[in-house]
């Protein structure tokens, strides 16, 4: 919005020319989202308490978590609001990729909101039926995948990290892969959101990484030099990523241990869905498995735990899944688990960025 209002004035006032630079708008998108979260955070927490929107804790979880009962949840609405407002203010809204990621963010946020609301009204840790929730997630992801596949100039190849000449073309099968990535990323972030700040930390590092890849992919000279797929217009998603990084840091101010508010499924599903969509649009689908390694680890710990439990007739691989609970039950303090997972996430982000040259 500001881009469209102020940049045209650069012919009269040269200092408005700064609005043409993605880097400038990305920085201020992050600052805007950060300020929104800082300013509205206390009000939202107070309002959630008044409405008795408190977290319902599972009885079969770690005993230490019982003290979290009643902590305000659904804080993800703050992240979504800050991201949407900041993106609309600073991005070039003629780029359809911007609207696409916003649609996924809002769509998955709405699914998470319905899930959170149902849990609160039932006073149960079970929300919307798993089948219904999955069906809604698949519908949104499938719609986005079809739109992208049908978009002129969008190709169905996938980039393999560390291999510059390996670009397999999946054809129409790309629709199914991209649908799987969006749905998988959303639920992976959702599974990780079990400790104070555990999900938002790695999410910030993931979006910072994709901020770089979106910027590089949107600049064909840089993309050609780095030998990564170039995508016209995708550089504007750097602004969206910047907004999420700013909102994430602002939210972490209130979500860090001991948390004053939880993002709930509203936040985790929207962040995960947006992350999956970014991986597809920037043509860095496989890279998500590296930079989002924490989310992958959490997901596979649940899959292996459930699978082995059924195959072995009641035996477990971990003391509890997702794996962050396993470390809690081993005696690790919650802040130690969180910070160590953050450290791993940062290292994985650096590894992902290194693929720009290691190819």
Swiss-Prot record:
It is a multi-pass membrane protein. GO terms for molecular function: metal ion binding; phospho-N-acetylmuramoyl-pentapeptide-transferase activity; UDP-N-acetylmuramoyl-L-alanyl-D-glutamyl-meso-2,6-diaminopimelyl-D-alanyl-D-alanine:undecaprenyl-phosphate transferase activity. It is found in: Cell inner membrane. Pathway: Cell wall biogenesis; peptidoglycan biosynthesis. It catalyses: UDP-N-acetyl-alpha-D-muramoyl-L-alanyl-gamma-D-glutamyl-meso-2,6-diaminopimeloyl-D-alanyl-D-alanine + di-trans,octa-cis-undecaprenyl phosphate = di-trans,octa-cis-undecaprenyl diphospho-N-acetyl-alpha-D-muramoyl-L-alanyl-D-glutamyl-meso-2,6-diaminopimeloyl-D-alanyl-D-alanine + UMP. Its cofactor is Mg(2+). GO terms for cellular component: plasma membrane. Its EC number is 2.7.8.13. The chain crosses the membrane at residues 26-46, 75-95, 97-117, 134-154, 166-186, 197-217, 233-253, 261-281, 286-306, 336-356. GO terms for biological process: cell division; cell wall organization; peptidoglycan biosynthetic process; regulation of cell shape. Keywords: Cell cycle, Cell division, Cell inner membrane, Cell membrane, Cell shape, Cell wall biogenesis/degradation, Magnesium, Membrane, Metal-binding, Peptidoglycan synthesis, Transferase, Transmembrane, Transmembrane helix. Belongs to the glycosyltransferase 4 family. MraY subfamily. Catalyzes the initial step of the lipid cycle reactions in the biosynthesis of the cell wall peptidoglycan: transfers peptidoglycan precursor phospho-MurNAc-pentapeptide from UDP-MurNAc-pentapeptide onto the lipid carrier undecaprenyl phosphate, yielding undecaprenyl-pyrophosphoryl-MurNAc-pentapeptide, known as lipid I. This is Phospho-N-acetylmuramoyl-pentapeptide-transferase.
């Amino acid at each position: 919005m500001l881009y469209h209002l102020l940049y045209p004035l650069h012919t009269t006032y040269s200092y408005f020319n700064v609005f043409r630079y993605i880097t400038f708008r990305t920085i201020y998108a992050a600052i805007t989202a950060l300020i929104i979260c800082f300013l509205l955070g206390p009000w939202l927490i107070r309002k959630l308490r008044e409405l008795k929107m408190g977290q319902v804790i599972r009885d079969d979880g770690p005993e230490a978590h019982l003290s979290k009962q009643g902590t305000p949840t659904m804080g993800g609405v703050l992240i979504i609001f800050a991201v949407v407002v900041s993106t609309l203010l600073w991005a070039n809204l003629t780029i359809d990729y911007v609207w696409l990621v916003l649609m996924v963010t809002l769509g998955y946020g709405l699914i998470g909101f319905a899930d959170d609301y149902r849990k609160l009204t039932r006073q149960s840790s079970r929300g919307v039926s798993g089948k219904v929730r999955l069906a809604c997630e698949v519908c949104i992801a499938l719609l986005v995948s079809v739109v992208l596949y049908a978009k002129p100039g969008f190709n169905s190849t996938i980039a393999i990290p560390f291999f510059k000449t390996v670009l397999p073309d999946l054809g129409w099968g790309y629709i199914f892969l991209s649908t799987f990535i969006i749905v998988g990323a959303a639920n992976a972030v959702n599974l990780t959101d079990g400790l104070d700040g555990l999900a938002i930390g790695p999410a910030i590092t993931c979006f910072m990484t994709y901020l770089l890849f979106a910027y590089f992919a949107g600049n064909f000279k840089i993309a050609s030099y780095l030998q990564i797929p170039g995508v016209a217009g995708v550089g504007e998603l750097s602004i969206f990523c910047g907004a999420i990084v700013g909102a994430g840091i602002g939210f972490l101010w209130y979500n860090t241990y001991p948390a004053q508010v939880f993002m709930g499924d509203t936040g985790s599903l929207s962040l995960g869905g947006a992350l999956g969509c970014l991986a597809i649009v920037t043509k860095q689908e496989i890279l998500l498995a590296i930079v989002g390694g924490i989310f992958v680890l959490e997901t596979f710990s649940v899959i292996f735990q459930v699978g082995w439990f059924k195959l072995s007739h009641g035996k477990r691989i971990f003391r509890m899944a997702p794996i962050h609970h396993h470390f809690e039950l081993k005696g690790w303090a919650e802040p130690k688990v969180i910070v160590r997972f953050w450290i791993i996430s940062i290292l994985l982000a650096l590894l992902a960025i290194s693929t720009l040259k290691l190819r």
